[in-house]
């Protein structure tokens, strides 16, 4: 019997949830995704200090003001890591724009264009890049503009069907619903000790998005993310993409128990689902009605924003040291 890792690959594309190139090459996955939290962890590791310093030197040479220099450096760090990761996976890498822009459509568009152009300028293949955009209304609008300009987007921090439908309407390439963070909210909100896989609210949310997309032949791909357990991963076997941490990937490789496909287009087509029409006002109202999605979206933006600020502080200190050496 083959491993659960190999069995899952029959139905789903497996994605490494790490920004560490050295770790990625050991995982055997097709794609990789990063976020500010993962990049911060990598940037703090001694083995990547030369990459960090190169990005800082490059940013300084662009002759911008202090704010522009930080922007240049942060995006260069991402691109450096992304290009290194792509040496070890055959598919795509997802790079994320600054979470502090989450409610500014035009700023997100401009930042994503800069990131994409920098990626290509440094030798990257644009077809192998997904730009991660937060699942706010403004973010989804930005993704729609970017897709029309040939920049593929991964709309992230998806916590309910409303966000997923809005992203599909915007014709984005891919959405990333967060299984584990949904699960965490329900545990915290209701004091439950846990949910069976059959009742897991995070698993159910992704399954609902999958069913809606496949029922109506929506081409936007689904990349389930933020898994807490191997059982959550297996419960979504058949989802287009599964973003899995290195720890859970290793568990899947060691287990040879049979895996059953849980999601399929054929089964989704049989479901009695009605299409939903969304305007901005309807989107905002339905998000307001969903306390979990509203709170987790806001929390996710805060976490990514906070980690970006920590990374900025580290970069600022490096820049100060370089300036002192050159004085």
Swiss-Prot record:
HAMAP family: Transaldolase_1. The active site is at residue 132. The gene is tal. Pathway: Carbohydrate degradation; pentose phosphate pathway; D-glyceraldehyde 3-phosphate and beta-D-fructose 6-phosphate from D-ribose 5-phosphate and D-xylulose 5-phosphate (non-oxidative stage): step 2/3. It is found in: Cytoplasm. Its EC number is 2.2.1.2. Transaldolase is important for the balance of metabolites in the pentose-phosphate pathway. One of its GO terms (biological process) is pentose-phosphate shunt. It catalyses: D-sedoheptulose 7-phosphate + D-glyceraldehyde 3-phosphate = D-erythrose 4-phosphate + beta-D-fructose 6-phosphate. GO terms for cellular component: cytoplasm. Homodimer. Transmembrane segments: none annotated. Its main location: cytoplasm. Belongs to the transaldolase family. Type 1 subfamily. The keyword Transferase applies. This is Transaldolase. One of its GO terms (molecular function) is transaldolase activity. Keywords: Cytoplasm, Pentose shunt, Schiff base, Transferase.
